[in-house]
């Protein structure tokens, strides 16, 4: 919204204890809505996610932030060892995680600051689509939790 593109989202999440159990990500300018409820699946505009499988593509699609491409993120991308050509997709807001949830992208490394309200809704969606969001610190994958005293997220990888 602030960047004057159509990729802003409204995010609504319900967090139970330390994990997301319900999420809605709506992109009003694009009229696209993703939602999920724990145990009931994930959806994009009424269609069950994931919509596509990674094996159907000739490229490995990596989602990255337009405004937050850090040296660490670039190094992470460079270190991905895959037999397919890498394709970088740049899109705004929570749509990055949603692209992975629907199978349009394979991975989203976020090696920079975000807040719990930035990720909770999309995390519920990717979780119900069969994907995951994991913390990523010092080259280690960790459980990604919510309802911490400080609402700043750790770095994470969605896939």
Positions of PLM-derived features:
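Glycine/Thr-rich phosphate-binding loops of Rossmann-like dinucleotide-binding domains
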Residues: 1, 72, 118
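Glycine/serine-rich anion-binding loops at beta->alpha junctions
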Residues: 1-9
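Short, solvent-exposed secondary-structure boundary motifs
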Residues: 1-2, 23-25, 137
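ATP/adenylate-binding site constellation spanning eukaryotic-like Ser/Thr protein kinases
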Residues: 7, 39, 102
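Acidic beta-strand-loop-alpha-helix segment within the catalytic core
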Residues: 11-98, 147-159
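Oxyanion/phosphate-interacting regions
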Residues: 75-82, 96-159
